[in-house]
Amino acid sequence: MARRYMIDSILYWAQEYHIDGFRFDLMGLYDVETINAVRAALDTLPGGRDILMYGERGRAATAAAPVRGQQGESCHAERSHRHLLRRHPRHHQGRLFHAREPGYVEGRPGSFWDIGGAVAAWCRSDRLPPHAPSQIVSYVSAHDNFTLWDKLLLVRYEKPEFTAADSTALAQNRLAAGIYLTSFGLPFLQAGEEFARTKKGRATATALRLR
């Protein structure tokens, strides 16, 4: 029933509202058969094969039944250039849960080879199952965790001023964009990243209040 509801809803949005892309949160919660069924249903629509479909690889802390798709594997079940897995380790800016840890753009020693793997969409790496470059989404920041700008400043300063211009951080911001925009795979840009968007050092936006 849940699978049918998902398929019917997505087909309705695609047909009635002409939505041409779908992003699945916590895609690891869904079983592979359901995700492939959604893809197959979209492909039956006029122009449906051009509709983008990708998802977050995680599944959060859950006690869901073991029938769910394996984390990081759901989108590899069907080899399709439209069936993308949002997994591009963010070595550009260090580990995302460690605010002070530098990445390649902040000059972390020994990180060059990590960047080499990321630029090539890990096609020659054993970190992921065999895949096409187009099955990888390349990005450095998203709605979760720190913005790129905040991460850059947190690495550089003990008490950063997030709204102040910083020429080094601006150059690092451009370098990060240059890397993933020219990498293999589908580039993903968080809205506002191009003008140094800040959440003032917060890892999430839940604590922010609209004024």
Predicted regions and their residues:
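Active-site neighborhood of glycoside hydrolase catalytic domains
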Residues: M1-A65
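Conserved alpha/beta catalytic core and glycan-binding cleft of carbohydrate-active enzymes
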Residues: R39, R49-T206
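Acyl/amide activation-and-transfer machinery of modular secondary-metabolite enzymes
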Residues: L208-R211
